[in-house]
A protein has these predicted regions:
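Short glycine/proline-centered loop/turn elements that form peptide/ligand docking sites
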Residues: 105, 109, 127-131, 147-154
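Conserved GNAT acetyl-CoA-binding A-motif
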Residues: 115-127
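A short beta-loop-alpha structural element at the N-terminal edge
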Residues: 16-30
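Conserved acetyl-CoA-binding loop-helix of GNAT-fold acetyltransferases
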Residues: 101-114, 133, 137
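Conserved GNAT-fold acetyl-CoA-binding loop/helix
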Residues: 33-58
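A short, internal acetyl-CoA/4′-phosphopantetheine-binding micro-motif in the GNAT/acyltransferase core
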Residues: 71, 90-100, 124-125
Length: 164
């Protein structure tokens, strides 16, 4: 086993996945905001931190089909989250910037795939090359490109689909 494989295995043992609760709202909001700022500094901020917290508290957590969080096993710090909307839409998958490349995103994606009723679809901003590469590595295919008119940020995006 290489050092990289050993580090990934250790990372898996030190991280647990669980369903999100309303008590996770502030931590989920922080991950959402920090991840977007780090990965997509070009992205327009269309909502305040307070409005984002209210949206996660009153819309995302209580109305989504499933929301899972990844947390440090020892201290409980939230590292990332994923959201399934409806039967087949991966609505969000975000990780803290310091939690990347540890297999956590892959584990969250596996949870969502397991809960979906078949395949999955998702939108990714076209300029988010790291996210696009992640989903393509996991078997998603780009099926449509949009000019950004469908999202609040007016940022061109890509519709991806995955079938089991």
């Amino acid at each position: 086993m290489t050092d990289y494989e050993a580090a990934r295995r250790l990372g898996h043992e030190g991280v647990r996945l669980r369903p999100a609760t309303l008590q996770d709202a502030e931590a989920v909001t922080r991950v959402f905001l920090d991840s977007r700022a780090a990965a997509m500094p070009y992205l327009a901020r269309v909502h305040s931190d307070e409005d984002t917290l209210a949206w996660i508290t009153h819309v995302v957590l209580p109305t989504s089909t499933g929301v899972w969080v990844a947390e440090e096993r020892e201290c409980g710090d939230l590292l990332g989250f994923a959201v399934l909307a409806g039967d087949d839409e991966l609505d969000h998958l975000y990780l803290r910037p310091d939690a990347l490349r540890r297999g956590i995103g892959s584990r969250l994606l596996a949870e969502v795939r397991g809960a979906a009723k078949g395949g999955l679809s998702l939108y990714v901003f076209q300029r988010n090359a790291a996210a696009r590469a992640f989903y393509e590595r996991h078997g998603f295919t780009a099926v449509a490109f949009d000019d950004g008119g469908r999202n609040e940020e007016n940022e061109p995006d890509v519709l991806y689909r995955w079938s089991p």
